[in-house]
From Swiss-Prot:
Cellular component GO terms held in the UniProt record: ribonucleoprotein complex; ribosome
Annotated Gene3D superfamilies: 3.30.390.140
Protein name as annotated: Probable small ribosomal subunit protein cS23
One biological process term in Gene Ontology: translation
SS bond list: none
Cited Pfam families: PSRP-3_Ycf65 (PF04839)
Keyword presence, Lipid biosynthesis: no
Role according to the record: Probably a ribosomal protein or a ribosome-associated protein.
Complexes and interactors: Part of the 30S ribosomal subunit.
UniProt-listed PANTHER family: 30S RIBOSOMAL PROTEIN 3, CHLOROPLASTIC, OS04G0461100 PROTEIN
Transmembrane spans: none
InterPro entries from the UniProt entry: PSRP-3/Ycf65_sf (IPR038447), Ribosomal_PSRP3/Ycf65 (IPR006924)
Phylogenetic placement of the source organism: Bacteria, Bacillati, Cyanobacteriota, Cyanophyceae, Nostocales
């Protein structure tokens, strides 16, 4: 997954997911943010990644699996926990937000 970074916007009522591509020493946005539970963020992210045919199946599956883990954590306990705890639980994911 080192070619891509899963980005999470951690909010009180929603969690949002986006993917950046690593380019050189920086990153470039690859997708917009998809919000959960406002919309089906996982399904929207899946469709967006599938539309980019140059992303390997392995990279796509790794990104979607990590997105599943983050969404499940947020649903089960994370929404009531500070973002710093989520950052510790998922160190390979980039977090930002207000919670």
């Amino acid at each position: 997954m080192s070619k891509f970074i899963l980005k999470i916007l951690w909010l009180d009522e929603n969690v949002a997911l986006a993917v950046d591509q690593v380019v050189g020493k920086g990153t470039s946005p690859l997708t917009k943010y998809f919000f959960w539970p406002r919309n089906d963020a996982w399904e929207e992210l899946k469709k967006e990644l599938e539309s980019k045919h140059w992303i390997s199946d392995l990279d796509r599956v790794e990104l979607l699996n990590k997105a599943t883990e983050v969404i499940n954590y947020w649903q089960e306990e994370g929404r009531n926990r500070p973002m710093a705890e989520a950052q510790l639980k998922f160190p390979e994911v980039t977090f930002t937000g207000s919670a």
